[in-house]
Amino acid sequence: NNARQGANTNETVLTPANVNTNTFGKLFTYSVDGFVYAQPLVMTNVAILGKGTHNVVLVATEHNSIYAFDADSNQGANAAPLWQVNFINPAAGVTTVPNSDLGSTDITPEVGITATPVIDPITGTLYVEVKTKEVTNGVTSYVHRLHALDVTTGAERTSGVVANSPVVINAINYPGTGQGGSDTDGAGHVLFNGLKEHSRPALTLLNGKVYLAYASHGDQTPYHGWLFEYDGHTLAQTSVYKTTRKCVLGGCWQGGGGD
């Protein structure tokens, strides 16, 4: 929930009578391609294209994959994912970020998707933050993107009620002095450092806006705490806030979850 207290104070289904060692526990397992720091998300009664209606569990990995699994059974046709998408393309120079690039061992051996995505049940859209390492013509960059995916197929939302996915996350002409070195442009603006910044807290959807927050990899400077707001329909950036305008650190922390 958006209050981040991790409690449902109006629970009516789970009770001490049905949550016990005899009737409650692990149902089955699925294999995925990387470590999972983000909390799995559940959406009920999802019409999967060509596969009928399912209760779905959505799982994000540090290998930059999103899986949609049937939440009730892994038998028969449900032994395979209902769909899977991946956001790397090694042949084109797009990979996850190796831990060796980061100067920190907080997450190993790679960094991709850490923050828990968020679902808009009205539009059937999954919003997810993805970090990649991209090498083009010998030049390396570290890129953060906000993706909006159709929960029924995993396809990017490029047009319609939710459009323009994906978008690159950045802060342009944000005023401040920062540390006064590589975290500024020398013209009074603080830079969003794609290598140093790490999306930690779960994404939040509130009043049609998607919120993303950032800290670092093991306090490797220069980094800042950032909070971004994007329109949930157009994916246009509508607001940016930085916690440390005249210094560094100030990260917005979480282990990848938040709910």
Regions found by a protein language model. Give the residues of each.
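Mobile, glycine-rich extracellular loop/lid and propeptide segments
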Residues: 1-259
